[in-house]
Structure formats: C-alpha cells, structure tokens
C-alpha cells in the first residue's frame, strides 16, 4: 500500500518541461504556420519579380500561362515538401532521437531562409521554388516530430494540454505572418524578401537553446536502452527525484512490446493488433484536411468583399480571423484535459458540419437576400472556431497516444503522409470544384465533416488520463486480439492499476 503514493502522484508543469515545450513549438511548429501564410500577402509582388527576372534574362515578359504555372509550382512545393518530410520522420527519429531530429530539421529552415532572403538580389525565382520545397520538408518533419516529442516528455495528466501547444504555435505563426505581411509593413516591393527570410529566427533560437533540454525518456529507455539517461531526463522534467513509478510504467510498455522491435509502415498495416489505430489516424488526419479548412480560407476574402468590406481592408479582417484561430486554440489547450479529446473532436467536427451547411445556403441566397453575406461571415468565423477546438489540434495528439513506442514513428509517417496529400489535393481540386458547383462546393465538406463525426462517435475512445499501455489495452478489445502484439500475452496480464502515474 505504501508504494501507491508515488504511483498516484500527478505530474506538474515544471520550468524545464515548460521551456522545452515552448522552444520545440516555437522553433518548429511556429515556422510551419509562418511559412503557410508568408507568401499570401506578397503574392502579386512576387509574381512581378518572376516576370521582371524572366525579362532580364530573355528580353521578353513571361506569358500569363507560364507565370501562373510558375506560381502554382512555388505554392505547391510547400505541401509536396511536407509530404517528403513526413516520409523522413521514421528513419530520423529512430536514428537521431526526437530532440536530435528537431535540431537537424533546422537545416531545412535556415538554408531556405537565406535563399529566399537573397533571391531578389540574385534575380532567381528558382531559389524561391527550391526554398519552398525545403521549408515544406521542415514543416513535414516538425508537424510530426514536435507532437511526438512533447507527448513523450509529458506526464499523462498534462499530455493533452501540451499536445495542443504545437497547433497553437502553428496558428500563432500564421497570425504573425499575416501581421508582418500587411501592406503597411513588409508586403512591399523591398520588404517581401525580408518577410520570407524571417523564418530563420525561430530556427536559430531552437538550434541554440534546445540542446540544453532532455531527450524523450521513452526514446532513451525503450530504444537506446539507457536507463540512467532516461531516469535523469525524467528527474529534470518532473522536478523531483522519485520517478521510479514512471520508469516502471515505461518499462512495462517496453516489456509489453519487446518482441516487436521497431515496426515499419508495411508491418504496421499488416498487424491485426494495430488495425483500428491505423484506420483511425487515417480518417482523422484525412478528415482534418478534407473538412474544408483550406477552402474556407481560400473563399474567405470573397465572402468579406461580398459583405461590403473594402478591398484594402480585407487584410485586416483576415488578421482578425487569424486572431480568433489563436484564441480558440488557446481555449483548446485549457479544456482538453477537462473535456477530453473525443468530446473536442465531436464538438469541432459538428460545428464545422453546421457551418458548411449554413454557408452553402447563405452563398446560394446572397444575391437575393441583402443580409446573407453577413451570415456567411458568421459561418466562416464559426467554422474557424470549431476547427481550432478539435479537428486542428487533436489528431496529431492522438497519434502519440494510441500507438506504443515501437509503432509510433511509423504511425506519424502514415498520419503525416495523409495530412499533406489531403492538403495538396484540396489545394489542387477545390478551384475546379468551385467553378463546377459554385455556392454548393461546401456541401462536399459538410458530408466529410458528418462522416468523420459519426466515425469518432462510434470508434474513437477517450484517451484522457490514461497511460499509453492502457489506451492500447482498449484497442486490443476493438481489434479482437488478446495483446498489444501478436504472439505475446503481457498486456492482458498487466494490471491497469500497476501502470497508473
């Protein structure tokens, strides 16, 4: 009975854990958000630069078709790079560790920042295209590795809140890019190279500061077999010396899957014991992007203009929308441990479903009913709120929670690949859908939101307050297997009370 006190001890947000979270999220996740939005404001200025560069080389201006193609390639290089970065996650985190991968990833930020910052002086739009590929790789790695790193650093009672922090910094990065990208600031003929090059600042800070913080204790113990280093990391993160209970929980996870080793993506797809976990992350990551979030932002400017917002003022309304996104993600940080992951997903996708349905009606009637454009604005804001509460931050957090150490890196590769391919698909296909369906384009996204909501309600369990082993114990029942991995009986024999933290 005396040994149960440390087992029930809850983790706290120590200075080391808080700073490691902030440095990892600012140095990596912030860059992702910043580079998503950085090219939006100066787009016309950059196209003019492409045209002038072509003229200086060939004494003729580029054709409209070729200019559109070049710009489309420049924009699409980012999600393509994200896809490439997602494929690199598994090999890098298993070889370099979680922290080591984040440090290595700064190469894909600092180098392109220098290239983009000097591209105008060098008169080379090829440098911008290459840089967009490189910052995309950076985003593909950071969008997967930061949630994994923070999820493995956190005690279970803070895992949800800290797991939402990467998405919070993505939204902050978007907002900062929107602010510094105002026409009165850096969205100018001389300022846009600086705007693009600023992404080097968070990378440099992370490169300087993150080495002083611990590697993932789970990586150190389970994959590196370094119990002493894992224990020291836990002591620093928890702020106390008595970490035996948590060490025991990690060792139980190691024992429960010792025969599996490091699982590859192909092996993971073949394993019956991981069937519903894999299906769930594919549906959640696909639903996150295919629910229409990028389409909403794409359409937002037209909606604001139709409501009477002046063209020169749309940029300020866009900043306001970005601020709402940040505020609601902050709310998610504080309520995720109270309401749980499942509730936020259900709430978020339901709000997005309703917003898409009402927006469809509002867009269809806006030429006949004078006040409908204002309903459209309400729908856009409501959609942003709903997505920020659940669909944006929770899926990446769940990948950390529903997979054990041996399969987690492969799971992030799959989830990241689905995320970036879905992102790319929406960007490629939505303009054609908009031309073909017009106001009814958002019905497609409403259906996807509804189907994702139904799946979550029927299949996805609540993971709040549970250890990784306990969560996988839930899935063994769903997968109709007796243990975590085939041919092993450890999990069913592990008393759940023994792995409480």
UniProtKB/Swiss-Prot annotation:
* Chief localisation class: membrane
| Reaction equation(s) it catalyzes | D-fructose(out) = D-fructose(in)
The record ties this protein, via CDD domains, to: MFS_GLUT_Class2 (cd17432)
The biological process GO terms on file are: cellular response to fructose stimulus; D-glucose import; dehydroascorbic acid transport; fructose import across plasma membrane; fructose transmembrane transport; regulation of systemic arterial blood pressure mediated by a chemical signal; response to fructose
Which residues are noted in the entry as D-fructose-binding?
A: 32, 167, 288, 296-298, 387, 419-420
Q: Which residues lie on this side of the membrane: Cytoplasmic?
A: 1-18, 92-98, 150-161, 214-277, 335-342, 395-412, 461-501
**One function term, GO molecular function aspect:** fructose binding
Keywords of the record, alphabetical order, are: Acetylation, Cell membrane, Glycoprotein, Membrane, Sugar transport, Transmembrane, Transmembrane helix, Transport
Gene Ontology cellular component annotations, sorted alphabetically = apical plasma membrane; plasma membrane; sarcolemma
Q: Where in the cell is it found?
A: Apical cell membrane; Cell membrane; Cell membrane, Sarcolemma
Q: Which InterPro entries match?
A: Fru_transpt_5, GLUT, MFS_dom, MFS_sugar_transport-like, MFS_trans_sf, Sugar/inositol_transpt, Sugar_transporter_CS
Q: Which residues are glycosylated?
A: 51
Q: Which residues lie on this side of the membrane: Extracellular?
A: 40-68, 120-126, 183-192, 299-313, 364-371, 434-439
Q: Into which family does the record put it?
A: Belongs to the major facilitator superfamily. Sugar transporter (TC 2.A.1.1) family. Glucose transporter subfamily.
This protein is called: Solute carrier family 2, facilitated glucose transporter member 5
**Which species is this record about?**
Equus caballus (Horse)
